[in-house]
């Protein structure tokens, strides 16, 4: 089956976007998503995004990590899809309905209200998500938030001093997190600026993670460390996060279209039906 796809990125967090709203249905398996995401033998991406018809929105967005796992939300991908759909769109996801709009070269997306209850993260057992009584070497007492997908946030003196490539996979797969977890290490520079690095569940170290920026910002606001809006700078560049309790998170940042091409999906594995 020949399909058209778009290569896009948000601050270096890159995607293969397949728009199947007006085509024959595209079957996306974990194996096929892994093959397409492979940077040596596939197209290459952090996440594969499949757009399908929706009865309640402009599109239904499904998100597959590079390891083939299907996940609930991706902030950078949402901005890219809003841009692809013309700059104003309502998008159906597993995490809920998201709305976005673009202006002055930036895309803003409402990502819903964060959740902080331990069972909404989810955690394996009850604890205070404002200062979890756990540690992995020098990383200790994280905060936790679910912003459509699960995150822990460690506030540290210097993000670059943390061996996130080593500690990230340990924390991601710890039994405390039954759905695995995205791992954020953040340094608060002042009340308007945070620096952030992210180990993304199912992906690894990434140049940018929109939901990670959101989880970190709302955690810092919750702890009284910063004001809103706050600028969160990742290795790929900055995002602006605006949030107050009782309101949805609004994330603003760029979305870049790199190229459009076609590929034969049969080269990346057979459909499950044969």
Swiss-Prot record:
Keywords: Amino-acid biosynthesis, Cytoplasm, Isomerase, Lysine biosynthesis. Its EC number is 5.1.1.7. The keyword Cell wall biogenesis/degradation does not apply. It comes from the Bacteria. The record marks 151, 200 as: Could be important to modulate the pK values of the two catalytic cysteine residues. Disulfide bonds: none annotated. It is found in: Cytoplasm. GO terms for cellular component: cytosol. Pfam families: DAP_epimerase. InterPro entries: DAP_epimerase_AS, DAP_epimerase_DapF. Substrate binds at residues 13, 47, 65, 75-76, 149, 182, 200-201, 210-211. It is an enzyme of class 5 (isomerase). GO terms for molecular function: diaminopimelate epimerase activity. One of its GO terms (biological process) is lysine biosynthetic process via diaminopimelate. The keyword Transport does not apply. Its main location: cytoplasm. Belongs to the diaminopimelate epimerase family. This is Diaminopimelate epimerase. It comes from Rhizorhabdus wittichii (strain DSM 6014 / CCUG 31198 / JCM 15750 / NBRC 105917 / EY 4224 / RW1) (Sphingomonas wittichii). The lineage of its organism: Bacteria, Pseudomonadati, Pseudomonadota, Alphaproteobacteria, Sphingomonadales.
């Amino acid at each position: 089956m020949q399909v058209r796809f778009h290569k896009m990125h948000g601050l270096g967090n890159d995607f293969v976007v397949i728009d199947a709203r007006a085509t024959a249905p595209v079957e996306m398996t974990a194996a096929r998503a892994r093959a397409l995401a492979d940077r040596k033998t596939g197209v290459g991406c952090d996440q594969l995004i499949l757009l399908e018809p929706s009865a309640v929105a402009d599109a239904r967005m499904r998100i597959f990590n590079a390891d083939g796992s299907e996940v609930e939300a991706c902030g950078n991908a949402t901005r890219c899809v809003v841009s692809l759909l013309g700059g104003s769109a309502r998008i159906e996801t597993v995490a809920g309905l998201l709305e976005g709009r673009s202006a002055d070269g930036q895309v803003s997306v409402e990502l819903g209200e964060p959740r902080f209850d331990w069972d909404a993260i989810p955690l394996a057992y009850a604890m205070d998500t404002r200062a979890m009584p756990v540690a992995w070497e020098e990383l200790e007492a994280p905060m936790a938030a679910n912003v459509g997908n699960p995150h822990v946030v460690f506030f540290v003196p210097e993000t670059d001093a943390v061996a996130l490539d080593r500690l990230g996979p340990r924390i991601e797969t710890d039994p405390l997190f039954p759905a695995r977890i995205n791992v954020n290490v953040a340094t608060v520079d002042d009340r308007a600026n945070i620096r952030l690095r992210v180990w993304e569940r199912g992906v690894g170290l990434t140049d940018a993670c929109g939901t990670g920026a959101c989880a970190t910002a709302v955690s810092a606001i919750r702890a009284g460390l910063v004001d809103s809006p706050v600028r969160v700078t990742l290795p790929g560049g900055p995002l602006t996060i605006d949030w107050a309790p009782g309101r949805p998170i609004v994330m603003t940042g760029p979305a870049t279209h790199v190229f459009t091409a076609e590929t034969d999906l049969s080269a990346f594995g057979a459909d499950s039906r044969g």
